[in-house]
A protein has these predicted regions:
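N-terminal flexible segment immediately upstream of the FAD-binding catalytic core
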Residues: 1-71, 87-118, 147, 270-282, ...
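Alpha-helix capping/hinge segments and adjacent helical runs
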Residues: 29, 424-436, 465-469
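General beta-strand structural signal in soluble alpha/beta enzymes
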Residues: 32-36, 58-60, 80-84, 91, ...
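C-terminal substrate-recognition/cap domain of FAD-linked oxidoreductases
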Residues: 34-43, 224, 228, 237-239, ...
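Conserved, mostly hydrophobic/aromatic
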Residues: 73, 214, 396, 464
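FAD-binding subdomain of flavoenzyme oxidoreductases
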Residues: 109-264
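Activity-critical C-terminal alpha-helical subdomain
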Residues: 188, 440-475
Length: 475
């Protein structure tokens, strides 16, 4: 069973006037917040119905400023919470124990695009989509594209090792991070690696920090690998009469030697909700359709893409699918992507919800989806399933509806545990890209025996013996 974090064994000091004076001397009076409407947003992220207020928020704009703030907090036993754009879904950056929140929003410059080496050096507060569009102007491509790419920061993506739809072909954030400048919990500054494509020199600190959710340090500069931007793509929406058929088709597509650049799953309710919410997207969906796959093929040779699309069509006809909608214009392509990327926004406007981030080997998707619906019936909750079927990553949006607060708080988590137990039994894990944060810690025992949790705590202790860096997260 879940073992409560050792965080509570640490004594933390409150931020006093002397500390506030020091913070202001480092970043300036206007960049230290303790009250006001602008301060309010730092108490929450996209995890619903949670509020944890930091005692102060600091907004540095240099590595030296971050280092000075962290060093002071370490010396005075004040907890530090690194914050990106606040798009996290697991309370990843919330100030569980008060202390100082350090936001990276002013570390927002793209420093250099190296077209010769296909690299970009950036600060962590750059919006993901802005970085993608900027390098695209040079004919270059940074593929990881979480649904929050229009608001999330690159630094936050690194914190959770984000993926997104294109991960199925191009990989996740860790596959593009070459080097990181990091402020350690004692205030020291280090580069984790080198700006090279191969590095077998000592332990891989770069990959250790990617996905560490701000528990080991604060990233202040990032070197990313880029690739040439593909010139063409074909996008199609494929309807199925059952979730079983749609999810079974996923594995068959890859077994046929086809590697889509995106392969997304949406059950029928997801599409109905999002189309109603958007209002201006009209996608014809037959009454008997229960699920859809959104599939993209891309590359630099349109003839080859069309042949691959024909091969894909042959595979799909082995399943109970309806008429395939091929997007025949950029506007229609954009509509299909708007529909997929806004499912979560649409569903959560109807009720309080929680979103789980399951991932299994893709052949087992049908079994997982059946189990999710069975658990929902057992615990009397509705759910909407959608996500990155191509790499087995299904998001489960559980809807509170009219459930009592007590039942939602105390019984629904038992259903979530049953879902995660099935996920792990199928060879999967409890988070593919959202991270563990604060809200998912209670499920870590499903995946990891206690000795492995102790190894993680040991790594944390080496970097952060005073446990000031994002305490209360992961374990």
């Amino acid at each position: 069973m879940f073992k409560e974090s050792a965080t509570l064994d640490f004594h933390y000091n409150k931020i006093d006037e002397a500390a506030l004076a020091f913070f202001r001397s480092i970043v300036g009076d206007e960049f230290v917040l303790t009250t006001g409407e602008h301060y309010e947003k730092y108490a929450k992220d996209e995890t619903e119905n949670l509020r944890f207020y930091p005692e102060a928020v600091a907004k540095p704009n240099t590595t030296a400023q971050v280092s000075a703030l962290v060093r002071y907090c370490n010396e005075h036993k004040i907890p530090v919470y690194p914050r990106a754009a606040g798009t996290g879904l697991s309370a990843n950056s919330l100030a569980i124990y008060g202390g100082l929140m350090i936001t990276i929003e002013r570390l927002n410059k793209i420093i250099e695009i190296d077209e010769n080496n296909l690299q970009v050096t950036t600060e962590p507060g750059v919006i993901t989509e802005l970085l993608q569009n900027t390098v695209k102007e040079k004919g270059l491509f940074y593929p990881p594209d979480p649904s929050s790419r229009g608001t999330s920061f690159i630094g936050g993506n690194i914190s959770c090792n984000s993926g997104g739809p294109r991960a199925v072909k191009y990989g996740v954030v860790k596959d593009y991070v070459l080097n990181l400048e990091v402020v350690l919990p004692n205030g020291e500054v280090m580069w984790t690696g080198a700006n090279v494509l191969k590095n077998s020199t000592g332990y891989n600190f770069t990959h250790l920090f990617v996905g560490s959710e701000g528990t080991l340090g604060i990233v202040t500069k990032i070197v990313l690998k880029l690739i040439p931007h593909p010139k063409f793509n074909v996008i199609m929406l494929v309807p199925f009469t059952s979730m079983d058929q749609a999810s079974a088709a996923v594995s068959a597509i890859f077994r046929a030697g086809i590697t889509p650049s995106c392969l997304e799953f949406m059950e029928r309710d997801a599409i109905d909700w999002v189309c109603n919410w958007l209002g201006d997207v009209t996608i014809p969906i037959a009454d008997d359709v229960r699920a859809n796959l959104l599939i993209e093929l891309d590359g630099n040779d349109m003839d080859y893409i069309q042949k691959e699309a024909e091969h894909l069509y042959e595979v799909l006809t082995q399943f109970d699918c309806g008429e395939i909608l091929f997007a025949d214009s950029d506007a229609q392509k954009n509509d299909l992507w708007r529909m997929r990327r806004n499912v979560a926004n649409a569903v959560k406007t109807t009720s309080v919800t929680i979103e789980e981030d399951t991932v299994v080997p893709r052949f087992y998707l049908p079994e997982l989806l059946r189990h999710i619906k069975e658990v929902g019936k057992k615990y009397n909750f509705r759910s909407v399933c959608y996500g990155h079927a191509g790499d087995g990553n299904v998001h489960v949006r559980i809807i509170k509806d009219e459930l009592s607060d007590n039942y939602w708080k105390n019984e629904v988590p038992n259903g979530v545990r049953e879902i995660f137990e099935k996920v792990v039994a199928l060879g999967g894990t409890i988070s593919g890209e959202h991270g563990i944060g604060w809200v998912q810690r209670r499920f870590m025992d499903i995946k990891f025996p206690e000795f492995q949790m102790e190894l993680m705590r040991g790594v944390k202790k080496v970097f952060d013996p005073n446990n000031i860096m994002n305490p209360g997260k992961v374990f």
